[in-house]
């Protein structure tokens, strides 16, 4: 508590300063939140055997988690843009904690879906408000701030393979109960964040008139709509590909390389770990070279690697997955900041739209890819999705960073 007063005083006196302690804490909370979500795909190999679920049913579980989060995130962002709710952050994590607790004891497929609904709802509340906190603490370093925030989430997702290998394989479904402790820790951190957030609202009240005027003067022109549509297509390409790897590459590795669940999960861990590193690097690169440059390079440079992956051997696959994760995910946080600058004054809405859309696209992809695997097999599906990053060529059509500044100057 000793740091609370100096921190508050510093942020009030110097609103343009990057508040690293808050960024680090909200990044840790993002990691804890997304580690709860990571329990779901981590549990797939366990549920597939213990409940005899099909790939389509596993896809429906992923769909429920991601679609609830996807639909609700823009709604939460829109609402809190108008009426900020600092304590929505701990409330959201409490909902996720209840979902995780129920998941540990769920006896049926339907019960699992109900528990996953609560986890998705908690995530939907957390993400736009967490992104807003990162924006408020960013100062002039928006790319770096969003990267710190998003790398926490990607690090949490990267825990899924470790969760499977170290907890769920030896303990089974009941092992999920330990993650109620993770949720409780996140709630404690978020209570502190909420207090800082509430204090910042007071100091920002003097600027609210100017920000409101900026938001009102930001016309949603055809050019803005066109840019948002392109962003949506790029999110689609990235989300479907990462959904395929995150949800189903474990089964591909087990089938193709004849490895155990634990060994197969190591491939996912490498992909997600380097994805987290890429997410962190993307923000500073965007601050230096421009957001459109990073978005374009991220997808186009990962395309040839994605095409090589289905033909790689068991050892080479580690390196290819690491490079794909590093390059492809470097645009994740950058896409959020680009959308926020595309429509200034709508921080929560744009964060909810882009991140929520990523969840939603991943949800649809999980169901579609699960059905495709059931119908065509694992290998043909992995070859087919390898061409998704090629859609990154659409980023050439995005307005440059300079053009965005001219639109809103």
From Swiss-Prot:
Cellular component aspect of the GO annotation: plasma membrane
MF annotations from Gene Ontology: transmembrane transporter activity
Superkingdom per UniProt: Bacteria
Membrane topology type: Multi-pass membrane protein
Transmembrane parts of this sequence: 22-42, 58-78, 99-119, 174-194, 217-237, 266-286, 293-312, 316-338, 353-373, 378-398
Alphabetically ordered keywords of this record: Cell membrane, Membrane, Transmembrane, Transmembrane helix, Transport
Disulphide bridges, residue numbers: none
KW Ion transport (keyword) present: no
Compartments, as annotated in UniProt: Cell membrane
One Pfam family hit: MFS_1
Signal peptide segment: none
Coiled-coil regions, chain positions: none
Family per record: Belongs to the major facilitator superfamily.
UniProt xrefs under PANTHER family: FOSMIDOMYCIN RESISTANCE PROTEIN
Protein name: Uncharacterized MFS-type transporter YfnC
Naturally occurring in which organism (per UniProt): Bacillus subtilis (strain 168)
């Amino acid at each position: 508590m000793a740091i609370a007063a100096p921190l508050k005083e510093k942020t009030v006196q110097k609103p343009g300063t990057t508040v690293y302690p808050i960024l680090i804490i909200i990044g840790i909370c993002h990691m804890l939140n997304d580690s709860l979500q990571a329990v779901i795909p981590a549990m797939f190999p366990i549920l597939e055997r213990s409940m005899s679920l099909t790939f389509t049913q596993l896809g429906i579980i992923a769909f429920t988690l991601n679609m609830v989060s996807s639909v609700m995130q823009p709604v939460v962002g829109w609402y809190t843009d108008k009426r900020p709710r600092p304590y929505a952050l701990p409330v959201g994590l409490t909902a996720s904690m209840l979902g995780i607790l129920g998941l540990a004891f769920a006896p049926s497929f339907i019960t699992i879906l109900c528990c996953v609904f609560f986890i998705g709802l908690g995530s939907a509340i957390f993400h736009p408000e967490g992104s807003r906190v990162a924006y408020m603490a960013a100062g002039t370093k928006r790319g770096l701030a969003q990267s710190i925030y998003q790398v926490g989430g990607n690090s949490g997702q990267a825990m899924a393979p470790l969760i499977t290998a170290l907890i769920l394989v030896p303990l089974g479904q009941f092992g999920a109960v330990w993650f109620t402790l993770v949720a409780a820790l996140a709630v404690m951190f978020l209570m502190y964040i909420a207090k800082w957030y509430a204090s910042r609202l007071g100091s920002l009240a003097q600027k609210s008139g100017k920000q409101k005027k900026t938001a009102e003067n930001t016309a949603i022109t055809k050019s803005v709509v066109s840019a948002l549509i392109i962003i949506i297509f790029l999110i689609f390409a990235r989300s479907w590909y990462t959904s395929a790897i995150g949800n189903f590459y474990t089964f591909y590795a087990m089938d193709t390389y004849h490895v155990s669940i634990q060994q197969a999960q190591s491939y996912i861990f490498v992909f997600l770990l380097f994805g987290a590193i890429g997410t962190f690097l993307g923000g500073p690169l965007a601050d230096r070279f421009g957001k459109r440059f990073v978005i374009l390079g991220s997808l186009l440079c990962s395309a040839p690697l994605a095409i090589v992956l289905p033909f790689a051997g068991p050892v080479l696959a580690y390196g290819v997955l690491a490079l794909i994760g590093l390059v492809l995910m470097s645009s994740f946080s950058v896409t959020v900041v680009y959308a926020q600058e595309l429509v200034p004054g709508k921080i929560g809405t744009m964060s909810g739209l882009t991140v929520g859309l990523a969840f939603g696209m991943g949800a649809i992809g999980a169901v579609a890819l699960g059905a495709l695997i059931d119908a065509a097999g694992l290998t043909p599906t992995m070859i087919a999705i390898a061409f998704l990053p090629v859609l990154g060529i659409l980023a050439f059509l995005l307005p440059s960073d300079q053009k965005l500044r001219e639109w809103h100057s």
